[in-house]
Amino acid sequence: MGPAALACRTHPAERSRQLATKKDSPATPRPSGGAGVHPADRHDLIRVEGARVNNLQDVTVDIPKRRLTVFTGVSGSGKTSLVFGTIAAESQRLINETYSSFVQGFMPSMARPDVDRLDGLTTAILVDQERMGANVRSTVGTVTDTNALLRILFSRLGQPHIGPPNAFSFNVASVRGAGAITVEKAGGKKVEKRTFERAGGMCTRCEGTGNVTDFDLNELYDASLSLNDGALRIPGYSMDGWYGRIFRGCGYFDPDKPIAKFTKRELDDLLHRDATKIKVEGINLTYQGLIPQIQKSFLSKDVEAMQPHVRAFVERVITFTACPDCDGTRLNERARSSRIDGVNIADACAMQISDLAEWLRGIEDPSVAPLLSGLQHTLDSFVQIGLGYLSLDRSSGSLSGGESQRTKMIRHLGSSLTDVTYVFDEPTIGMHPHDIARMNDLLLQLRDKGNTVLVVEHKPEVIEIADHVVDLGPGAGSEGGQVTYQGPVAGLAASDTVTGRHLGDKAAVKATTRDRTGVLEVRGATTNNLTGVDVDIPLGVLVVVTGVAGSGKSSLIHGSVSNRDGVVAVDQSPIKGSRRSNPATYTGLLEPVRKAFAKANGVKAALFSANSEGACATCNGAGVVYTDLAILAGVSTPCEDCEGRRFQAEVLDYRLGGLNIAEVLDLAVSDAVGFFAEGEARIPAAHKIAERLNDVGLGYLRLGQALTTLSGGERQRLKLATHLGGPGEVIVLDEPTTGLHLANVEHLLEMLDKLVDGGRSVIVIEHHQAVMAHADWIIDLGPGAGHDGGQIVFEGTPADLVAAATTLTGKHLAAYTA
């Protein structure tokens, strides 16, 4: 075989090394090491030995560098713990240690993962599913630096010329000043008048947020009560805490006087007073009126990123309307007056990104050629990655987890870095099968530049392009954490692992469908890109809403259905959970259990809470003691007094059904179902919640397991189980297969059938073909994304969709069920 043939069979990531080798002179002595191999070329593996993070059971695995490795396994098997919690975490920790101790003091401290040995690590770049931008000022344009490039472009080419790039920024306010200064010249002093002006683009009325707010004072407080009697209805504003001490000590009003009897001055001080220094109980504090305080503490965050109870308060009390001065563009009139070819910067940011890219191609000016090239590359990357339907003024907090992850990828697509480890967490989340091929091309591009690409993924389409596969299992939680297979994809398909058995799964289109019991009428829907959509959504059946990303699925369902009475919506927003939160506290299961313990033992229920009176005094109910080591990573050690059980010793003497409260919290969900079903420990309310957790496939979780240890898929199903207990007759689910293994999807379908057979209507927004094939009715939106979508392109049964095969969804479903 000739050299040309050998080159054709060489992996792309190895070609750069071969080129470098060819440049070596024959006279150049090679370092000792035998076999003519350069010592530096021996480090071709990332070696993990004895990993024990979360549920990993002394995992040892070798991962090839400069290859695409996909990590598979059922949800909760330990994939994220190995890739993110071990490999990526240690890489980032080692990089942080290269900075000076002064710089490290400003960086988050990271503990070393529980692993015996890690070799061959390179710089890790994490691209995860975390949503972006809790700040109300954060947009798609700001997080990708595209806005900055646009501002420079308009400052150079915009007519009329209004100033530097800051003049087009909605985060910079215009400032003007004047005064006299003393200037010393030639030994003499002279007073001169000087003025200065900083041009900013911020709209002064909405302060660059694009919205103005109107407060419903009746929802803010009960005017018939005094402050001391609990008039305030604001989350966290308790008179028992610091707010109460400030209100009582400020002297601006009488806290025992009903608010309805306040004078105009007192009411203004309560609601609108500017920040004022006061002294309360000998402590210097700042008093501020309720409305500016709420704007500062609540409205500085994006509504989508708020905790549920805070979000409910904001939606109840505050009405958001587009700013009348800037029409929601965030920019002042001066910034909007400068134009390029009739387009101002607000118009450009409001364009669909694919349209903006085309508009920029029409601008030809040698003076800004490098700027246009960089801007064009970024916008083309959006289109290439399947996000061309977004606009730069879209709030980053409104992006789904999948959209956020792909937006983060934009920064890396044009990077010239090589020998970097890229780590992705299910990059195909929220992607239609039609878009997955483009994502695969991007992953291969990163690999072919000589990078190591590690991907946690469930989709067969991504697994099939892998150079190497690591499968974890065999089960989830304590039943997982082991490497069940590692090697090429062909070997995985032939292996007897859960993933191997399901890799080639094909779904059969449902032969018989249920009959509808009624319809939900939607008429003239125009949310976002919807074009006056009229549709009747069947009730009493399983309805699946499909379409490419950006086609209008969420706009139709969340904009026209989710807010109706009797509808319970489970969206993709992440659940909030600290290291003290666990499935028992999050679902409300612990409350009836505490009451049952109290009743059985004749004591207070507060004793059976690790966050209240029953908490171990040494660790405050955390189960571990945290030691702060300043710039070094903090250390957590099991509490010696309670031995990690979180409760006082005397509390553990009280029993119910033969178990104390710590032992109950250590039960697996599947065991808890039986424990709460009969005997002394029979607690119907707790039994019902445990059953729901078991039904969504979380039977392996422990009731007291910290939420911070759960994977993304586990958290999604935990949230789903909580909402399933609601009173709604119609349940809306937004991509419930997120984070689910192929085997777990079967359990999800069984649960959906159980809901429908129980008399509920289920509407699912989904891309997974197995869910589509199982539907009673499909509503397909498209034909494309953004302004190319927003129309109903098909309504009917899965069999009819496959038979017609005229839409993108129909073609992919036909291929999946063939």
Question: What role is predicted for each listed range?
Answer:
Residues 8, 14-398, 404-423, 442, ...:
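P-loop/Walker A nucleotide phosphate-binding surfaces of NTP-dependent enzymes
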Residues 152-156, 492-514, 595-599, 802-818:
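C-terminal boundary and immediately downstream tail of ABC-type ATPase nucleotide-binding domains
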Residues 425-427, 734-736:
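Walker B catalytic acidic pair
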Residues 432-437, 741-746:
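Helix N-cap at the start of a conserved alpha-helix in ABC-type nucleotide-binding domains
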Residues 452, 464-471, 754, 761, ...:
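Conserved catalytic segment of ABC-fold P-loop ATPases
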Residues 456-458, 765-767:
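H-loop/switch region of ABC-family ATPase nucleotide-binding domains
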Residues 468-504, 581, 586, 780-812:
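Conserved beta-strand-loop-alpha-helix hinge in the C-terminal portion
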